[in-house]
Amino acid sequence: MRLLPLLLIALAGAAQADECTAWGRPGAVLFQDDFSGPQTGWVVEYARKPGNVVENRDGRLLMDVDGGATVWLDRPLTGNVQISFMRRVIVDGGKNDRLSDLNVFWMARDPKRADLFTRSGKFEDYDDLTLYYVGIGGNRNTTTRLRRYGDGVRALIAEYTDGAHLLAPNRDYRIEVAVYEGCTRVRVDGNTWFTYRDPRPLRSGWFGLRTTWSRQTVDDLKIQRLD
């Protein structure tokens, strides 16, 4: 009769041992952009039509679109890295203003081809990639989710629906994404929102700033090696 409690204790101990607790220290800067100059080092996927804008403006990257948009770093990342940036969702009467979808892709790869940059910006175009994805304030600012894509499955790792983990308008958020020794983590304003130890960790791939139907800005982006 005592086997079940002992088994549960053993399982709990195994889970605790598998938690992500070490994250290294930020080291060499691999890439940084303050978006004050020409838009270089990025590949942009979105519907190019009147009213849609993805460009550097007033010292920030501006994404002002009525559909999906992804701004990819034009080079892959490998190994233990930390990505940090400031991001704001603008709600101020603009035609695309909508409080939703502060999203990020990282460690993205296309299992079928070497060229990742073949998509239109529509969200469903990315379903067949392998990647990590965080969607803060998705579904009209009702959910915040961490997913792992792979083999055609968009596995839900964790989710929040409470107001503390949803978006506020016109606020600058410090977003930090880390990949370290088989774990990935998302922090917002210094608070850890998600950690995940991946049994099949994604160790290299592309990073993308992602949104759908909104007006957002990005600033002070830095990517560092984690030692």
Tell what function each PLM region has.
Residues 1-7:
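Sec-dependent signal peptide recognition
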